[in-house]
Regions:
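N-terminal functional module of multi-domain proteins
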Residues: 1-120
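Intrinsically disordered, low-complexity regions enriched in acidic/Ser/Thr/Pro/Gln residues
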Residues: 107-140
């Protein structure tokens, strides 16, 4: 069962969120038939969207993450509602790269680093709030 756990320090200065999203990631993989590298990238994006969406105060709000890194995976989109429920897709789910020399998946290489990371927050106003930044490494933490 997927869940989000949030905690706040006594002074309110530090907030943490922890997400377990195994079911959502397995469901996404069953739908999209992703390579190991593609599902790692999509799964990380789904977790990030879920954490950020859960922070929305508006009941009908949505949060959308878009990653377009110029790598072989193409674009990645993850959408969350205010309860942390997510859906997402990767443009080229079959794309895969060999593992890195340290044995880990090369998510950064598959995403690419020549592109943008965009977050859109739609809280039911006329236009959504949109913020973008250039990708640095292609890694999705």
């Amino acid at each position: 069962m997927d869940e989000i756990i949030r905690a706040v320090s006594k002074d309110g200065f530090v907030k943490i969120s922890v997400v377990t999203a195994r079911d959502a990631v397995q469901r996404a993989n069953a739908i999209h038939h992703c390579s190991p590298t593609a599902i790692a990238a999509l799964g990380r994006s789904l977790c990030a969207a879920s954490m950020l969406g859960d922070l929305l105060k508006e009941e009908n709000g949505t949060l959308t993450l878009r990653i377009s890194g110029g790598g072989g995976l193409g674009g990645i989109i993850a959408v969350s509602d205010s309860e942390g429920n997510v859906r997402g897709m990767v443009s080229n789910p079959a794309f895969d790269l060999p593992t890195r020399p340290d044995g880990k998946l090369d998510v950064g290489g598959a995403v690419g680093k020549d592109g943008m990371f965009t977050v859109s927050r739609d809280i039911g106003l006329r236009e959504p709030y949109v913020g973008s930044t250039e990708l640095v490494s292609g890694e999705i933490a």
